[in-house]
Amino acid sequence: AANRVSTLFGPDAVLLILPADHLIEDQSSLAESVEQAVSLAATGKLVTFGVVPTKPETGFGYIECDTPLAPDCFKVRRFVEKPDQQTAQNFIESGRYIWNAGMFCFTAGTMLDEIGHFLPDTLNLARDCLAASHHGTDPDHHVVQLDASTLHKIADTSIDYAIMEKSEKIAVVSARFDW
């Protein structure tokens, strides 16, 4: 997606990646968090969203917040996969951890730079796939039918593990919405 968006709109175009299965009813709080994320993304950050925990939860991943970058925005110290109950309780008590919402915001150029740094082969394969794919002609919709013969060559890897947990450019917006 970052490759296509960069081609169409330039490397400073901002992408917002949201899971389809999240229900966020407080749209004004979501909009505020997105505005904060867009501002951070414009400075070259890969931004993730965290939700302030209401209880120890072993079914969610956590983000440890580091130094503040702006109100409710922090440099990320580390990501922690689903902890046990006692560790989750310790996280809540520390006040430094928030739930990982699995939502992202970044410029196309920053993401492409990080993919190129951590996964150069994947970036080259993705560019090959995009070049071989069918691009729709409707000027109002940028539909791409990915080429299956080149797509299957790209490793199936999570953005969390491949980029977010390795990059030094990660920031988190501590969102105030429930999800």
Task: Describe the function of each predicted region.
Residues 60-179:
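Catalytic core of tubulin tyrosine ligase-like
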Residues 1-68, 106, 112-118:
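Conserved beta-loop-beta/alpha segment of the NTase-like Rossmann-fold superfamily
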